[in-house]
Amino acid sequence: MKHILSTPKLVRLKQRQEFLDIAASGKKWVMPGLILQAKKRIDEKIGIGFTVSRKVGNAVARNRAKRRLRVLASEALKNNTFAGYSFVVIGRAETNKRPYSLLRQDFIQALAKVGVISKRKSAQPIERLKK
């Protein structure tokens, strides 16, 4: 059974050109735990790509950072608010060291700064994760 309010399709950005297009003509905001780049899409899908450079550490550290960023993005982007945007989330050296709650706040604030969500929504307290 289909839901009336279905979530838009999440599309992974995989090709280098997609990343370069967003970097060249999108908006960018730097936070201590991550860098977020966003660009409006033609369709109503949500594009998401992750990248972590070798500056962050060895392969284990880079993969851990990408895993944390993937979970963070999947939680934050699960509603319809972000349909029609592509995002590139870039991991930084602090991504692995930063507590998850602060990393999550960084992501929400970056979404507000690039203009994807209103600043009022980002100012609301972020619900605690249930353990």
Residue ranges and their predicted role:
Residues 1-131:
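Positively charged, solvent-exposed patches that mediate nucleic-acid binding
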